[in-house]
Amino acid sequence: MRILIRNTWILLLGLLLAIGVSARTRHGNDVVFVSELPPEARHTLQLIRQGGPFPYEKDGVVFGNYERLLPKQNRGYYREFTVKTPGVRNRGARRIVTGGELNSPRELYYTEDHYASFRRIQE
């Protein structure tokens, strides 16, 4: 009986810790510094700042934030840009999502798992 109670408490503690981690990443509170990004992401940032040209037709389209992982904003606030993935023939899973003005965004987010999680890019 004691083992069952102990295991239940361990399980509950694990769930609480997992929920805490999820809440931190939900609104992009996890941070990645530009210097920590893969070189392809740094190149995409450079293209965003200079206004292109972008290698993919869908770069710069409105990102709907349907996953609701980023802070809520009006439609059109967020835009997405592809980060090339070496060895992948399609667009891959990596993206930079910007918020605000197209060429001078106020917010930058990086996802390497196709919108399952985001990290805010810190200059």
Q: What is each PLM-predicted segment?
A:
Residues 3-20:
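Bacterial N-terminal signal peptides
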Residues 4, 8, 26-28, 97:
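Small/flexible residues
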Residues 23-72:
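N-terminal secretory signal peptides
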Residues 55-123:
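Functional cores of ribonucleases/endoribonucleases
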